[in-house]
Amino acid sequence: MKKVEAIIRPEKLEIVKKALSDAGYVGMTVSEVKGRGVQGGIVERYRGREYIVDLIPKVKIELVVKEEDVDNVIDIICENARTGNPGDGKIFVIPVERVVRVRTKEEGRDVL
């Protein structure tokens, strides 16, 4: 099993969520996060003064999937989150050793 973590633009969340759900990947965790990368910060104005905001609001989507589903999940996220501009995000794939359903204590791939 693998955990897929995708950091994407907030405005792309709904379309990515729908595409994943339509493909059968309904279990996910979504968090509001802030970060920076190549895109750097942005300049905002407040009461006539300019401020550099160096941490940009993003959304993190986390899914645990079967290893054979990882490439499909990555393709779905990329196809639906891409704008072609810096700041589109990153995807991380992390090994998962164990999954346990809290309610029943069942374990393994079947609890996904």
Curated annotation (Swiss-Prot):
Involved in the regulation of nitrogen metabolism. Regulates the activity of its targets by protein-protein interaction in response to the nitrogen status of the cell. Regulates the activity of the ammonia channel Amt2 via direct interaction. Pfam families: P-II. PROSITE patterns: PII_GLNB_CTER, PII_GLNB_DOM. ADP binds at residues 29, 37-39, 64, 87-90. Signal peptide: none annotated. This is Nitrogen regulatory protein GlnK2. Keywords: ATP-binding, Cytoplasm, Nucleotide-binding. ATP binds at residues 29, 37-39, 64, 87-90. The lineage of its organism: Archaea, Methanobacteriati, Methanobacteriota, Methanomada group, Methanococci. It comes from Methanocaldococcus jannaschii (strain ATCC 43067 / DSM 2661 / JAL-1 / JCM 10045 / NBRC 100440) (Methanococcus jannaschii). GO terms for biological process: regulation of nitrogen utilization. Belongs to the P(II) protein family. GO terms for molecular function: ATP binding; enzyme regulator activity. InterPro entries: N-reg_PII, N-reg_PII-like_a/b, N-reg_PII/ATP_PRibTrfase_C, N-reg_PII_CS. GO terms for cellular component: cytosol. The keyword ATP-binding applies. It is found in: Cytoplasm. It comes from the Archaea. Homotrimer. Interacts and forms a complex with Amt2.
